Amino acid sequence: MEFITILLSTALFIVTFLFLFRQGAKRARFVYLVNKLPGPTAYPVVGNAIEAIVPRNKLFQVFDRRAKLYGPLYRIWAGPIAQVGLTRPEHVELILRDTKHIDKSLVYSFIRPWLGEGLLTGTGAKWHSHRKMITPTFHFKILDIFVDVFVEKSEILVKKLQSKVGGKDFDIYPFITHCALDIICETAMGIQMNAQEESESEYVKAVYEISELTMQRSVRPWLHPKVIFDLTTMGKRYAECLRILHGFTNKVIQERKSLRQMTGMKPTISNEEDELLGKKKRLAFLDLLLEASENGTKMSDTDIREEVDTFMFEGHDTTSAGICWALFLLGSHPEIQDKVYEELDHIFQGSDRSTTMRDLADMKYLERVIKESLRLFPSVPFIGRVLKEDTKIGDYLVPAGCMMNLQIYHVHRNQDQYPNPEAFNPDNFLPERVAKRHPYAYVPFSAGPRNCIGQKFATLEEKTVLSSILRNFKVRSIEKREDLTLMNELILRPESGIKVELIPRLPADAC
């Protein structure tokens, strides 16, 4: 018996030794390959994490400086975690187009408590199933229905902005945010949020705070373990934000399900104009998910909440930023703003009628303005992926296991693709110029199998809101671009908002 015990113990020791030796050799190779990449000197244990412990309004400068100093391909160590930054379109393409590298990087795990396994953060068979089911919901007829919501909320926005005409300059960002929140609440969940009628929104505050907390946690390796993070003040604030965000969505889902049961409501394309309780009923994203779950698709209440939360986050915060940056750039370049006016005047002929889907399709120059705004200030400044296998990128072999940071902000400033990359020039998106560029030189909505399925929705919303504002006002930006402080959060925002002055546009104004 003793002999067997000794034999088993010896075997266990040998197996353990071989495993640890193999893991040690594997780790040594990983570290060796990573350290061959350009990058700053890393300190023991913490790596380069100390460099990112700066005031939140300085964090973007840290990332920007690294990219300019060490790019187009470089590495940093966040404690034991290797992060590789990419700033060239051909390098980014290698990651985005390949289904092997489809999993999101570590930073996304920090918003998973909020968004769960929705389309932004999910992986595997569940992600594939939901992606396949949800993608058709953004077809033309449904987007046409959503345009009615865009127009209605934009008209409320214009009325709110009228109160700012003739006064001092003001921050237009909160006005746009509340308009976008009204839009996304009605299109995503079928509810009237009325955020534009109220000065404060608990939901909006929670979205902003959870985004900031996520970024602050991501640059502090010692806060990565959940058990530690949950004990901190930041962790407690995060939990409170989750309570607000999940509570809001859960309440709406339950109310919507109850309404469907009471009324036998089956909203489909054929009856979205039916009268419900004396009011026209519009189709909402939530209705489509509930209908799918009733028709055999396996979606639990949690699955539905995760997709609605994802749609709410991606469809309101990103769009708000895109609209505000476009207004800032137009307000800084009156000659380009005048060209937009000319296009709108040609479409509407001086009429104050509501915007239609056909009108939006005719706004070709405004669309180029939006694209150029998103090039200079992409709403999502970086995309993170996990490298699943050793990959040759440029002159380097990057080992599997690295966290890949696809720096969209810098990809969009590649001088080989954009000869004057800092200039605001909507003609960068003339068809003949686009055809000459690398297909991954412009990826504000990501690209490949995990591209944003809501990009058409976002573009139509931005066109509607911007055209509504510009038909009624001339916009003048107060600050210069170099005076703005960019915030490196989940969404690229200016620290102090976008300060503008509005000048009323008279009916007789010539464009």
Swiss-Prot record:
Transmembrane segments: none annotated. The keyword Protein biosynthesis does not apply. It is a peripheral membrane protein. It is found in: Endoplasmic reticulum membrane; Microsome membrane. InterPro entries: Cyt_P450 (IPR001128), Cyt_P450_CS (IPR017972), Cyt_P450_E_grp-I (IPR002401), Cyt_P450_sf (IPR036396), Cytochrome_P450_Monoox (IPR050196). SUPFAM superfamilies: Cytochrome P450. This is Cytochrome P450 4C1. It comes from Blaberus discoidalis (Tropical cockroach).
